[in-house]
Amino acid sequence: MKTDSIFYNIFQEFPFVFFALLGIPADATNQYQFTSQKIKQLAFRLDGLFLPIVEDAQLPFYIVEVQFQPDPNLYYRLFAELFIYLKQYQPPHPWQLVVIYPNRQTERENSLHFQEMLELPKITRIYLNELSTPETGSLPIKLLKLVIEPENTASDLAVDLARQAQTEISDTTVRESFINLLETIIVYKLPQKTREEVAAMFSLSDLKQTR
């Protein structure tokens, strides 16, 4: 599974995680649907879209890009896709672009062409390694940081997150899905292990049974 697919799975299943990144209250998730949309002229899809599902012209729609490899052409592509999307669909909402990086070293700004655009309030660049994680209310941020956690400490963080989920997520179905997602991330980080081995190694199965 590719890194961007993991993030899109997270946003699909737990959209409050995305809004936590932006410092927006979790109840904003009730106003949005996470989806993808095809751009016909270029035969590609925007895989990360948060589209408003309520009639409020002030609500922005969000284009989300996850970039874990240096790409000098990224902003050329992103802005081309954005403006072609605007021309083709003419959405009734203002746009916001959110780009998620593991760290600043991965970004290629191309400041000659894009410096002024990247400084617009419409564009948010997030560097996961710089996110702070307070002791309380930090479950969404910790979940995303698990993706960049070193292999030798990822298992401990996964177990901590599973235990934190027991306390903070009251809905049993949501909690089960959250722990399954933790397992998926760890299997991605430790591809030599099966999901069953990961669950056994980190006692995630035991955590499930004790809920």
How should each PLM-predicted stretch be described?
Residues 1-211:
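Elongated, amphipathic alpha-helical interaction scaffolds
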